[in-house]
Amino acid sequence: MNYLYLCIRIMEDSIKIGLDAKRIVRNGTGLGSYGRTLANDLAGIDGLDLMLYAPDKGRDSLRNQVAERENLHFCYPNGLYQTALGKAFWRSKGIISQMQHDGIQVYHGLSGELPVGIRKSGIKSVVTIHDLIFMRHPEYYHSVDVKIYTRKFRQTLQEADRIVAISE
């Protein structure tokens, strides 16, 4: 936490950060807990404005675990992005135009993914990689899933400005 704080303070006095909030509003443990803890901790730092981007409102009980603060806001897709397919597209690509409109300077993909094209958008990006079990033990997964996860992982590595690895 101190390292992240130091990096942000060096960059400038005020910064707008976008966080991938899908797991924050949908997962009670694991990735969701990680995201809620990070969002709450970052919200306590002066000079940060946080925008939590989620494809929908998810579960009230999880969303309510995120502190209500002046510098923390949830953002959801609108219009054509309301269908399941639309939400998936928004999260993987359409979110970029919304972040540009919102003035996001840094986006953190909390669950190992970044929107396609974020590098070209001018928005700096950080991604947290939690595990690569699908690569180490592909026998635990359907072969199609391994291919999808591998493609997404490699794409994310190409897009990311910084990578946080929190497991072996």
Model-predicted segments: where are they?
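Carbohydrate transferase catalytic cores enriched for Leloir-type hexosyltransferases
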Residues: 1-168
